[in-house]
């Protein structure tokens, strides 16, 4: 014996929405009739189909129409004994009026809201009439505090320290503090770059004197066609240090990129990218080999080897590469001669 199917009831309104109270009452009444007529009196009943109540609003009265019975009559098929009985959904006008009054008193009706109720007031007021005046008058002493704060942040001995402080004083005296703070931050960003957060490293030429003789020779071989000998570069470096530092802001991006770079091989000394700001790229440009030497304090060995092997930018091999090729070819010929003697 298979389990009986579940019965369901669906209410559909063809005109307007159904009142919630009437719908609940019809549903309870229909379920009661189903349980009373089928489950109690006929325990063997199994295949009860779902039923649908369709309410049509005619002249202000709700008239239930049994959609299933109408469909069966249109098809010319009589209801089968397994379909069960049709539930009657009649209701008097007095009962409908009572349900409507109860719904209105509970506030569950679908009509318009009663805005005359004192509780139904506006929750959010977007008018600007009651807002206070929030105009702000800057404190004249704030400039002094900003100056002291920035002066404490700037590293002592930095070449841009005096320039930043002088620019700050001019901004504070010539404009209000509403714009002085912004101008000060922009000045520091363009002048000092990202070196304010870290102490500046003093550039000393004495640290370059401990380089091995082979490194000095390699750097001299490279520096001759570009900037003279290593000694000439050292003398020119002291001269460049006294030049204008107007191009410091242009190197801020290079400084940040250098500090964020993750070196595969850790250098012996900490890189000093601030040394590049001592030179004006428009007046006295530096090649990438000299830039490497100034930043890391040692000549770029791998770069110089590559340069000696593949030549300058013109494409011709350098003297060092030619000598290396001659030496390699000479050794190769000697090996061939030795091989012939061995065969004899």
UniProtKB/Swiss-Prot annotation:
Residues 331-344 have a biased composition (Basic residues). Keywords: Cell cycle, Cell division, Cytoplasm, Cytoskeleton, Mitosis. Residues 71-115, 234-255, 310-344 are annotated as: Disordered. Residues 319-330 have a biased composition (Low complexity). Its main location: cytoplasm. Part of a checkpoint which monitors spindle integrity and prevents premature exit from mitosis. This is Protein IBD2. It comes from Eremothecium gossypii (strain ATCC 10895 / CBS 109.51 / FGSC 9923 / NRRL Y-1056) (Yeast).
């Amino acid at each position: 014996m298979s389990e009986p199917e579940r019965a369901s009831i669906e209410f559909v309104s063809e005109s307007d929405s159904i009142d919630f109270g009437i719908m609940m009452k019809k549903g309870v009444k229909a379920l009661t009739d189903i349980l009373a007529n089928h489950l109690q009196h006929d325990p063997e009943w199994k295949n009860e189909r779902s039923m649908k109540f369709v309410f049509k609003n005619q002249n202000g009265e709700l008239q239930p129409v049994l959609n299933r019975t109408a469909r069966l009559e249109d098809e010319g098929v009589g209801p089968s004994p397994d379909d069960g009985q049709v539930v009657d959904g009649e209701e008097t006008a007095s009962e409908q009026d009572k349900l409507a009054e109860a719904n209105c008193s509970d506030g569950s009706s679908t009509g318009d809201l009663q805005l005359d109720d004192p509780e139904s007031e506006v929750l959010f007021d977007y008018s600007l009439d009651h807002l206070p005046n929030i105009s702000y008058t800057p404190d004249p002493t704030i400039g002094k505090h900003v100056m002291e704060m920035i002066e404490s942040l700037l590293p002592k001995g930095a070449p841009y320290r005096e320039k930043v402080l002088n620019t700050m004083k001019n901004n504070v005296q010539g404009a209000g503090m509403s714009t002085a703070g912004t101008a000060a931050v922009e000045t520091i960003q363009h002048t000092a770059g990202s070196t304010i957060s870290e102490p500046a490293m003093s550039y000393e030429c004495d640290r370059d004197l401990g380089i091995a003789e082979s490194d000095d020779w390699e750097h001299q071989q490279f520096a001759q066609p570009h900037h003279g000998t290593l000694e000439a570069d050292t003398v020119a470096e002291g001269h460049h240090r006294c030049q204008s530092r107007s191009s410091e802001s242009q190197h801020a991006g290079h400084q940040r990129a250098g500090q964020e770079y993750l070196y595969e091989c850790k250098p012996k000394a900490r890189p000093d990218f601030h040394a590049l700001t001592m030179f004006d790229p428009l007046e006295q440009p530096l090649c990438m080999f000299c830039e490497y030497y100034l930043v890391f304090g040692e000549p770029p060995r791998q770069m110089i080897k590559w340069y000696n092997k593949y030549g300058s930018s013109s494409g011709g091999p350098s003297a060092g590469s030619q000598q290396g090729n001659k030496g390699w070819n000479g050794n190769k010929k000697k090996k061939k001669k030795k091989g012939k003697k061995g065969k004899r």
